[in-house]
Design a protein with these regions (language model features):
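Helix-coil boundary and interhelical linker segments in multi-pass alpha-helical membrane proteins
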Residues: 1-10, 46-60, 388-394, 494-500
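Intrinsically disordered, low-complexity non-transmembrane regions of multi-pass membrane transporters
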Residues: 1-5, 103-106, 167-182, 235-262, ...
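Helix-loop-helix junctions within the multi-pass membrane cores of secondary transporters/permeases
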Residues: 62-151, 284-439
């Protein structure tokens, strides 16, 4: 009995450390997502079982990989400029921290946010079990309203687009200038058009047949589409606008917990809601949390954080002038409202990102539904025993313990990797590094999806270059997932993504 216990414990510890290693790789390599690792392990699971490796250990590898990934994926987003869909919103704040010489501080705030998101989401699992378990069973009622809920949330996300744009001259002429310059309605309209355009792109892409030229298992066009929309497009912008960086301050101290408790708790709540709703991501949850904070601030008579893309102000300054301003602020040690907002956005996004990972694992065992590629792999690997009694299942407790351990281990890893990345910045010219990442991501896309994926990557990149030039948030590109799901659910068709 004791021998069997220690045998299982050793497999679990080995899986934990190997998963932490894989999560570090997926977090740092742009375009290489934990879902790819999960699907590869799923394909290899019969062979691993024959070698004597238990499926519980394979599951622990997947879970620990996903947890560490959510901690470390801020680093390529901010220090290289190659985010995945979940960290799209952190690019601009993280990039501003980098330009101001405060990249280390951004990494520290991200680590604290992920840590709080991990711990604050744990009590929410119990709340979710009560609400969505067999006693109340809210999920059946929620499922009937799912497309309406997704539509309402999408409209709320679009409504938070506060950018003011000019209507085209012909529109102004037709309407007698009732629709004129500096119009918020024009910004909302532009965001809506881009959201729908990304959705149609996603609907077309996910219907395409695709095979890997080298036989990689479960090829998915989600990789090239998201890599184009949020990764390569950002990298090209950075390559064209930034040639050198200021010296970076070695400020790796974690921020105090108390000021971040409230925003990170609501981030965990938003992450929990995103965990049960298919197609919603950490980026959308972050926008909702920041929007909610703005509403609360206005109710209290305070000034909220703006989420505008100040296109007119930016076009008045050249890239060199913007860099000089950032360096000057770094040298003076002045922390303005923009810096405070950037740091809070980084912490909130990291908290949401990690909370979503914890909650999708919880919902897998509460309602038996997968909400990510990793949990889908777990569900396909072996039967999931749902949490129907007062006590959680042993399998769920084991994987939750692995999640906590992986999150604790990820904290010092972030500091070590962040320091190494900044040394790379000092040793390798930024533009050379960016071009190297673009070539690497393109090669990875070809290996996994062939020339079809390359075509999808090119189209996605073109779409991804549009938002900053129009003046809207790039996160509206998540219509690539939301719009197809809403189309399928409203039409009462089978969901080809496996979320419902």
């Amino acid at each position: 009995m004791i021998e069997a216990y220690f045998h299982e414990l050793w497999w679990l510890l080995g899986a934990l450390f190997f998963g932490v290693f894989l999560g570090s790789l997926t977090g740092l390599i742009p375009g290489f997502h934990v879902n790819n690792v999960a699907l590869i392990l799923l394909a290899l699971s019969p062979g691993l079982l024959e070698l004597g490796i238990p499926l519980s250990a394979v599951a622990a590898i997947i879970v620990s990989t996903g947890t560490v990934h959510t901690f470390l994926n801020y680093i390529p987003s901010a220090l290289i400029g190659a985010p995945d869909g979940d960290t799209a919103l952190s690019l601009l704040p993280g990039h501003r921290m980098l330009l101001a010489g405060n990249a280390a501080r951004g990494v520290a705030w991200s680590a604290r946010g992920s840590q709080l998101g991990l711990f604050l989401s744990l009590p929410l699992i119990i709340v979710a079990r009560i609400a969505f378990g067999p006693e109340l069973n809210w999920y059946d009622g929620l499922r009937d309203w799912l497309p309406v809920i997704l539509l309402v949330i999408s409209l709320l996300l679009l409504a938070t687009e506060t950018t003011r744009l000019d209507w085209p001259k012909w529109v102004q002429k037709i309407t007698g200038k009732r629709l004129g310059n500096d119009s918020r309605l024009a910004g909302f309209f532009a965001a809506t058009i881009f959201f729908l355009l990304a959705g149609l792109y996603g609907w077309a892409v996910f219907e395409l047949p695709v095979d890997s030229p080298v036989g990689m298992p479960s090829p998915s066009l989600l990789l090239p589409s998201l890599a184009g929309l949020f990764g390569i497009a950002n990298l090209l912008d950075i390559y064209a606008t930034t040639s050198h960086l200021p010296p970076q301050k070695e400020n790796w101290d974690l921020p105090p917990v108390k000021p971040l408790i409230a925003p990170c708790f609501w981030s965990a709540v938003a992450g929990a809601s995103m965990g049960v709703l298919p197609g919603m991501t950490a980026s959308q949850a972050t926008v909702l949390v920041m929007g909610g904070r703005n509403v609360a601030a206005k109710v209290q008579g305070k000034e909220g954080y703006g989420m505008d893309w100040e296109t007119r102000r930016l076009t008045e300054l050249s890239d060199d002038e913007l860099l000089e301003i950032a360096v000057a602020e770094a040298e003076e040690g002045y922390e303005g409202p923009q810096t405070k907002q950037d740091l809070e956005v980084i912490a909130i996004l990291s908290a949401v990102n990690t909370a979503v990972t914890v909650m999708v694992l919880g919902f897998l065992y509460i309602i038996g539904r997968s909400r990510s590629g990793a949990t889908l792999a777990l569900k396909m690997m072996y039967p999931i025993e749902t949490w129907n009694s007062s006590q959680p299942t042993a399998d769920f407790v084991r994987l939750l313990a692995v999640t906590l351990a992986a999150g604790i281990m990820a904290m010092p890893i972030m500091k070590i990797v962040g320091k190494g990345m900044l040394r790379l910045h000092a040793a390798i010219p930024l533009q050379s590094m960016v071009m190297g990442v673009i070539i690497f991501v393109t090669g990875l896309v070809w290996l996994s999806t062939g020339f079809v994926g390359i075509g999808v990557l090119i189209v996605g990149t073109i779409l991804g270059l549009m938002p900053p030039r129009i003046g809207i948030r790039r996160s509206h590109g998540m219509g690539i997932i939301l719009v197809p799901i809403m189309i399928y659910t409203f039409a009462q068709m089978a969901d080809s993504f496996g979320f419902i």
